[in-house]
Amino acid sequence: MPPAISAFQAAYIGIEVLIALVSVPGNVLVIWAVKVNQALRDATFCFIVSLAVADVAVGALVIPLAILINIGPRTYFHTCLMVACPVLILTQSSILALLAIAVDRYLRVKIPLRYKTVVTPRRAAVAIAGCWILSFVVGLTPLFGWNRLGEAQRAWAANGSGGEPVIKCEFEKVISMEYMVYFNFFVWVLPPLLLMVLIYLEVFYLIRRQLGKKVSASSGDPQKYYGKELKIAKSLALILFLFALSWLPLHILNCITLFCPSCRKPSILMYIAIFLTHGNSAMNPIVYAFRIQKFRVTFLKIWNDHFRCQPTPPVDEDPPEEAPHD
């Protein structure tokens, strides 16, 4: 018999389904926009596609698995562990994609004349592949042994049972808090976030310094170039801010769990933290639509062409912005 679902669980499931219904179509639209608009094909937008793929997977895979875990089925330990690992992989992929985006924007303003020779499509593809490979290594580490199998086996043996332990599948019953705090948070989440903050501060400093310079007749219109860079940098920094705002509460709660085992964590706080992490996947397409004109125009074209059956003229694909001369 499947476990009965309480009214609270039903509300939780309803909110999760709503988040998924916003996240999946929104991020598919982001990927679609990059596919149809040549002006969205530079390295930054390739990294944005990688981020969108992770967000689609959150809505299509992680949220259904989170609902399953919330219902609390009894499973073999390693089955539950495999259910818990995808969220770790996708979170790490998002962080590394955001870091790649930050580095890309830094290079655009630091070496505008050499940017296209340094950041080639091939190198961008290699960076994206590297981010995903590293994400799988970090996210699957619990499967390689850093988990709570020993505790589960002792409890299982104490009941006089043999074989692989069967447990009520919950995240904290299979994932070690030492892994979540010392390895995941202190190594793979917090340092990249702090590094990205420093990178964006440097990006804004470089752009402001360039915009403050006097324009000469042969400068290649740096005001226009750096003005566009400033707008895009602000939008991408907002994406980073929302990511940090969404994920830090859950990691802080994990720290409390590890360092203060006797401290009570109200269930409502855990649910809010989980909603924030999943909801972050639905936020990015909204930011793109309101903050980045190329995305907004392409979204409207896709809507008119494929959903309203009112074909519109081709998207005005701006030529690549000419880098200013030194």
UniProtKB/Swiss-Prot annotation:
Q: Where is the lipid attached (S-palmitoyl cysteine)?
A: C309
Sorted alphabetically, which keywords does the UniProt record give?
Cell membrane, Disulfide bond, G-protein coupled receptor, Glycoprotein, Lipoprotein, Membrane, Palmitate, Receptor, Transducer, Transmembrane, Transmembrane helix
Topology check: give the Extracellular ranges. Answer: 1-10, 70-80, 147-176, 260-267
Coiled coil where? none
Q: Does the keyword Transmembrane helix apply?
A: yes
Name the GO terms of the biological process aspect. Answer: excitatory postsynaptic potential; G protein-coupled receptor signaling pathway; leukocyte migration; long-term synaptic depression; mucus secretion; negative regulation of inflammatory response; negative regulation of leukocyte migration; negative regulation of long-term synaptic depression
List the membrane topology term(s): Multi-pass membrane protein
What Gene Ontology molecular-function terms does this entry list? Answer: G protein-coupled adenosine receptor activity
Q: Which SMART domains match?
A: 7TM_GPCR_Srsx
Give disulfide pairs as residue numbers.
C80-C169
**What's the domain of life for this entry?**
Eukaryota
Matches recorded under InterPro entries = Adeno_A1_rcpt, Adenosn_rcpt, GPCR_Rhodpsn, GPCR_Rhodpsn_7TM
Entry's transmembrane regions? 11-33, 47-69, 81-102, 124-146, 177-201, 236-259, 268-292
Q: Does the keyword Lipoprotein apply?
A: yes
Spell out where the chain is glycosylated: N159
What are the annotated GO cellular component locations? cilium; dendrite; dendritic spine; plasma membrane; synapse
Side of membrane Cytoplasmic, spans: 34-46, 103-123, 202-235, 293-326
> Where does this protein reside within or beyond the cell?
Cell membrane
The record's function comment reads:
Receptor for adenosine. The activity of this receptor is mediated by G proteins which inhibit adenylyl cyclase.
Tell me the PANTHER family matching this sequence: ADENOSINE RECEPTOR A1, OLFACTORY RECEPTOR AND ADENOSINE RECEPTOR
- Give the family per the record: Belongs to the G-protein coupled receptor 1 family.
Indicate what this protein is called per its UniProt record.
Adenosine receptor A1
Which gene produces this protein?
ADORA1
